[in-house]
Amino acid sequence: MAENEHFRNGIDYVELVNQEGHTFHYICRAGNMNELVDMAPVILRNLDLLFQYDHEGRQCTHIAAEYDVSNAVMKIELLVMLGADINSRELKFGNTLLHIAAGTENYQLAEWLCKKPGVELGAINFLYKTAYHIAYERQNARMMEILRVNGAVCDDPIDIDESDETSSESNEGISI
């Protein structure tokens, strides 16, 4: 009964548990869909959860996209239904979900995002790159085709000198 009481009031989900954020961020990162669905009433009572950043400048949608590739679409779809911003940017590089999908080679997420009304298909991050630029630099023909076929902005990036500092920056394994 005590466990159900904690779940109902949501305190366990909104308190910081470590430097990586709170339990809600953990569920977005590594939890299963049932945990996220069960948490929906707590989220609806605490909508600010959807917009809080973790220690690396990521919101819940960015965390799901980057760390739970196999469940990213389902998690993000639920989070957006609950009120998350599908076009939000993480704070480190200004990447959107589409940038993250290109960087993690999450073809399913990229295709879903491209077909979702309201998604900024030509969003430019802080390094002046679109999702297509990331796929182009990684020579990921499959991702480039998904973006091209689904109407994303697909201009070939200007070749940048390899010694340029910005070309070697990375974000948790997502070199952009």
From Swiss-Prot:
- Record's keyword terms, sorted: ANK repeat, Host-virus interaction, Inhibition of host NF-kappa-B by virus, Repeat
Q: Which Gene3D superfamilies match?
A: Ankyrin repeat-containing domain
Q: Answer whether the UniProt record assigns the keyword Repeat to this protein.
A: yes
Q: Which GO terms describe its molecular function?
A: NF-kappaB binding
Q: Record keywords: Transmembrane helix included?
A: no
Q: Name where the ANK repeats lie.
A: 56-88, 93-123, 127-156
Q: Which Pfam families match?
A: Ank_2
Give the protein's function: Suppresses the host immune response through NF-kappa-B inactivation. Possesses ankyrin repeat domains required for NF-kappa-B binding but lacks the regulatory regions required for dissociation from NF-kappa-B and degradation. Therefore, prevents host NF-kappa-B release and subsequent activation.
Q: Tell me which family the UniProt entry assigns to this protein.
A: Belongs to the polydnaviridae I-Kappa-B-like protein family.
Protein's name in the database:
I-Kappa-B like protein G1
